[in-house]
UniProtKB/Swiss-Prot annotation:
Name of the protein: Histidinol-phosphate aminotransferase
Organism of this sequence: Campylobacter fetus subsp. fetus (strain 82-40)
Gene3D superfamilies: Aspartate Aminotransferase, domain 1 (3.90.1150.10), Type I PLP-dependent aspartate aminotransferase-like (Major domain) (3.40.640.10)
Catalytically driven reaction(s): L-histidinol phosphate + 2-oxoglutarate = 3-(imidazol-4-yl)-2-oxopropyl phosphate + L-glutamate
HAMAP family (alphabetical): HisC_aminotrans_2
Family in the record: Belongs to the class-II pyridoxal-phosphate-dependent aminotransferase family. Histidinol-phosphate aminotransferase subfamily.
PROSITE patterns: AA_TRANSFER_CLASS_2 (PS00599)
GO MF, one annotated term: pyridoxal phosphate binding
The entry's keywords: Amino-acid biosynthesis, Aminotransferase, Histidine biosynthesis, Pyridoxal phosphate, Transferase
Length: 366
């Protein structure tokens, strides 16, 4: 069978290894496996959400309310925006896909940081768009400005991942707003706030308020997700917030019922459980200090993280791939950043006992 020729050259996103695969490959008992590779919530899912899912499970034969009225209402109350300014996606990456189908093409490219979330580039290539990247791995707005100034007519979408995955750094909000002021109103600026709950908990200077963003800039799209801080990675629920014109355009690309009945109920309930969110954030930054101290004691380079992970960058004397492979055989799943052309490992911040075991075993490898 023949397929469209461009399909052969499309990159595939490298996700963290699932626990099930490690069990099959190495015969390790599930209870002995620690997965800190995919930035999932180590506290799991809110008990209130689990109870809600159980109660709604009997309705699994029914399609969800495709207006997502109650979820949009909850997000509207949280961010003080109108429901008409919100779109729901099967993970925020689906809305990234919508945005690129709406704005990018073979003549209109995208601008991203040197090292950032891979799906921007992958979805851009789906529509044949050219990728413009900064030389700096971290977000460098001076480079963004220069590349945009030089290629303004050829760039239709700019992605700012704040905080940035997989490095963890985060720009101050005032820097971001200052940058967007210089961007044409016909260029879509996407603020990917998948980890924003963590960033604003650590520093108010990093918080990008969606209401202020879309009131100030008609060309801005804010993305959020329930996969990280809210502990619903397996439910696949994300959202976008923008002015009504952008939301209407994205809705034209959305298939009906793009999240499930159970996912919808889980997200609605998750928004109500502030205690679980608070516990998640407190555990994260308490345990983050353990990793930072380990890195300092062992002369490992790391970038200050405003997320739920930390990235260790190794010098030429260490091999991140070898370290990850050796730990994997012992049931420790971490994220090798080889696919980003980095000799580095990204580690999700787990619970105390998980972190201690991981660092004890990592110590033996370095």
């Amino acid at each position: 069978m023949k397929f469209n020729s461009h399909i052969e050259n499309l990159p595939i996103y490298e996700a963290g290894k699932p626990i099930e695969l490690v069990i099959r490959e190495f015969g390790i008992d599930q209870n002995d496996i620690i997965k800190l590779a995919s930035n999932e919530n180590p506290l799991g899912t809110s008990k209130k959400v689990i109870e809600k899912i159980k109660n709604v499970a009997q309705n699994s034969s029914l399609y969800p309310d495709d207006s997502y009225y109650e979820l949009k209402d909850g997000l509207s109350n949280l961010y003080k925006v109108e429901p008409k300014n919100v779109i729901i996606g099967s993970g925020s990456d689906q809305i990234i896909e919508f945005a690129l189908h709406a704005k990018a093409n073979e003549k209109k490219g995208i601008l991203v940081s040197g090292v950032t979330f891979a799906m921007y580039e992958i979805y851009a290539k789906h529509v044949g768009a050219k990728i413009y990247k900064t030389k700096s791995k971290e977000h460098n707005l001076a480079e963004f400005r220069e590349i945009y100034r030089t290629n303004k007519n050829d760039i239709s979408v700019i992605f700012l991942c704040l905080p940035n995955n997989p490095l963890g750094e985060c720009l101050d909000a005032d820097e971001v707003f200052s940058f967007i002021k210089d961007v044409s109103e016909d260029t879509l600026v996407v603020i990917d706030g998948a980890y924003m709950e963590f960033a604003k908990f650590k520093s108010s200077k990093k918080e990008i308020d969606p209401k202020t963003l879309i009131q100030t800039f008609s060309n801005a799209l804010y993305l959020g997700t329930f996969s990280k801080a809210y502990g619903l990675g397996g439910m696949r629920v994300g959202y976008g917030i923008a002015n009504e014109e952008i939301i209407k355009a994205l809705h034209r690309l959305r298939a009906p019922f793009n999240i499930t009945t159970l996912s919808l109920a889980a997200a609605i309930e998750a928004l109500k459980d502030n205690d679980f969110l608070k516990e998640t954030l407190e555990n994260n930054f308490k345990e983050m200090k353990v990793y930072e101290e380990f890195a300092k004691e062992n002369s490992i380079e790391f970038i200050e993280s405003y997320t739920n992970f930390i990235t260790f960058i190794f010098d030429q004397h260490q091999n991140a791939t070898k370290i990850c492979d050796n730990l994997l055989k012992q049931g420790i799943i971490l994220r090798n950043l080889k696919s980003y052309s980095m000799n580095a490992i990204r580690i999700t911040i787990g619970k105390n006992e998980q972190n201690r075991r991981v660092l004890d075993m990592l110590k033996k490898e370095i």
